[in-house]
Amino acid sequence: MLILNQRTQQLATDSVALAYDERKRSRLKVTLASGAEAGIFLERGDHLHGGDKLAAEDGSAVVEILAAPEKLIEAIADSPLLFARAAYHLGNRHVPVQILPTENGGKLRFQTDHVLAEMVRGLGCSVSDAEAPFQPESGAYGGGHHHGDESATDLHNPGHGPHRSVPKIHEFKPR
C-alpha cells in the first residue's frame, strides 16, 4: 500500500476523487483511479482541496486529489443584498459554504440540510438540489491548508499575502 504524506507540486501519476468530508480527514484509506490501495496520512487539522497533490513516501507516485461530485443544496440570490443576507445567516451557523458568482447576486452551495434550505428559501433565494464537487471557503483563518514548511503559527511569516496575521488569544487577568 502506498503511503501518501507529502504535499508536492510535481505532475500527478494517479488520482483519487474524495468528497468534502473525506478531504477533511487526516487519516484515510483510499483506492486510487489505477486501482492501487493507498493510505493518506496528514497532520491533524490539515485538509485537502481539489487539485492538491500528495507524493508517496517512497517517491513512487504523485496522486492528485479530485473533489468528487456530491449531493448539495444550491441557493441562488438575485441581488447582492440577498446574497449577503443568505451568506451571513449560513456563516452565523458555521455552515461550510461554497461561494460562486452570478450576474446579479451570487450562488451558495452547502451540504444537504432541509432546515437550512428552508431558511435561505425563506430569505428569498431560489433553492434547488445539485450534484457537484464541493469546495467550500476555508474560513477566516485559512482552514488548515498548508504547503511545505509554511506554518500558520510562525509569527515572522503569519500567512499568505499582506495583512494576514495569526489569531491572538487574549489573556484576561483578574482585577
UniProtKB/Swiss-Prot annotation:
Which InterPro entries does the protein's record reference? UreE (IPR012406), UreE_C_dom (IPR007864), UreE_N (IPR004029), UreE_N_sf (IPR036118)
Instruction: Give the highest taxon in the source lineage.
Output: Bacteria
**Main localization category:** cytoplasm
Where would you find this protein in the cell?
Cytoplasm
One Pfam short name: UreE_N
Q: Which residue intervals make up region (Disordered)?
A: 134-175
Q: Does the keyword Transmembrane apply?
A: no
What is a single cellular component term in the Gene Ontology annotation?
cytoplasm
Presence of keyword Chaperone: yes
CDD domains, per database record:
UreE
Question: Mind listing the UniProt keywords for this protein, alphabetically?
Answer: Chaperone, Cytoplasm, Nickel, Nickel insertion
Any GO molecular function: nickel cation binding
- Name any Gene Ontology BP term: protein-containing complex assembly
Q: What is the annotated role of this protein in its UniProt record?
A: Involved in urease metallocenter assembly. Binds nickel. Probably functions as a nickel donor during metallocenter assembly.
Give the family this protein belongs to, as stated in its UniProt record: Belongs to the UreE family.
What name appears for this protein in its UniProt entry?
Urease accessory protein UreE
- Organism, by scientific name, is Dechloromonas aromatica (strain RCB)
Source taxonomy: Bacteria, Pseudomonadati, Pseudomonadota, Betaproteobacteria, Rhodocyclales
Gene behind this protein: ureE
